[in-house]
Amino acid sequence: LNHIHEACAESQDYLFELKQVTQKLDINIVSAGFDPISKLKEIPNNPKQRYELMTKDMPLGGELSLDMMYRTCGTQLNIDYNSEEDFIKKFKIVNSIVPISIALFANSAIVEKKKSKYLSYRSKVWQSTSRGGLPKIFFEELDFEKYAEFVINFPILFIQHEGAYISGRKYTFKDFMEGKIDKIGNRPPTENDLTTHLSTIFTENRLKKYIELRSMDTCGWDCLCSGPAFFIGMLYGNLDEVYEIISKWDKSKIINAYLEAPEKGFNTQLMGKDLLYWASTLLDLSKKGLEKRDILNKRGKNETLFLNHLQKVIDNRLTNADHMINKFSKTEDLSELYDK
């Protein structure tokens, strides 16, 4: 896919197919970052062997890890980089603006059929999840070598060996590389082992062959394409200007804003301004970036049209979470949360 118009059209096709199936099965779709109805114990376990191991081990490092596994839903965006320098800038930006992303895309305010104190309870859960969060090293000039060091010194979740999943939580990937894991015969890791390890690092953003952005609550069709548009406009069209802004931010203040944003949303403070200010600033830069790209659809519209939803959020100071609360509070009817 070459641009947001194509990605959005493909997403619309998937949604159409999903609705065809769910209507036949009398299943409702809820576009939210957290299951608003079910209690954790009511959700059946995934029968896969790795989920059995994760269900046992994950809570040891984060009290809400099982909620992450079974009750959260996010919109993930994968972006490219064309050089190490390009990666360094993009990765520092996406980590620095996680608090803004949480506030702007908040959509998980209802938990177990009740209004919670959080606008993005999904983000709160991910902050209390084993192997997650925003490591301080992510705010540095993190090149490929430093990221590789971070990865190999990160604890292993599990190892696939002779058809079984084996807990690796007592070992780092470096231990694996040095042949220190007796229960797998001290064998060295394969490329598949590294791929598995990379996929079990649950930080807000992470590097594989591309950068994965994972800080957005999922949302309905009216806003689904706004996330890609917001980030692509900044990172592909206005990278240096955004980088100059975030380079002046103090990492301790970013982390504090990150911890407060799930509950306080736009009222969270960062560098003396609230997150609404920063969201508006970044949206303007994103819009300029998309205008520079000037990629048109068949009707002659450029990609800025996908930012219209976010502009309304900022103008009205009302997120998807606020709309969710308003709908639910009027009647406490959970059907109000279903996609129509």
Whereabouts are the PLM-identified features?
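Residue-level marker of positions within ordered structural domains that often coincide
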Residues: 82, 99, 218, 236, ...
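An exposure/low-complexity boundary signal
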Residues: 140-161, 276-303
